[in-house]
Amino acid sequence: VTCRVLTTVVSELTGTDGFGGHVGGDDFVFMSAPSAIDAICQTLIKRFDLVIPDFYDPEDRQAGFIDSVDRRGNHERFPIMSLSIAVVTNEHRDISHPGDVSKIASELKKVAKSRPGSVYVKDNRTNPPDSAPESTPR
């Protein structure tokens, strides 16, 4: 479902100028012109949040979570699935090494996952990737 929503939205908003795909596990990627990023992220979140509740029982949807067992066998409440989007862009700073893209994405993904619900976090820092952040990413 996630990949279908992603590829549909990217295609609708960028035509052949964008790309969306599955990296592995629960990780996906899309590439587009910076000018399309906000519209893509907002549309992805809107559509994902619209279809995902249909995969849950009515009681779980109402509660906002499911009761289940985690990987270690512990009883836990898991919230209804949401999207955490990390936006890495070269709009404000040069990214000269592919490894920096992964590093920045990882930093932003942690920030996104710390927030409730479906969100996107955009890297607006202007300093080089190897230096300390100037400000909190948004």
Predicted regions and their residues:
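A short glycine-enriched loop-to-beta-strand structural element that forms part of the catalytic core
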Residues: 19-22, 56-106, 119-125
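Active-site-proximal alpha-helical element of nucleotidyl cyclase-like catalytic domains
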Residues: 1-16, 48-51
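Short amphipathic alpha-helices in soluble, non-transmembrane regions
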Residues: 41-48
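Flexible, glycine/charge-rich interdomain/linker segments that couple
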Residues: 91-92, 111-138
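Two-component transmitter module helix at the DHp-CA junction of histidine kinases
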Residues: 11, 49, 53-60, 117
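Protein kinase-like catalytic domain
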Residues: 52, 106-109, 113
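Short, conserved charged micro-motifs
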Residues: 36-41, 95-97
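Short beta-strand->loop micro-motif that forms the acidic, two-metal-ion catalytic signature
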Residues: 21-35
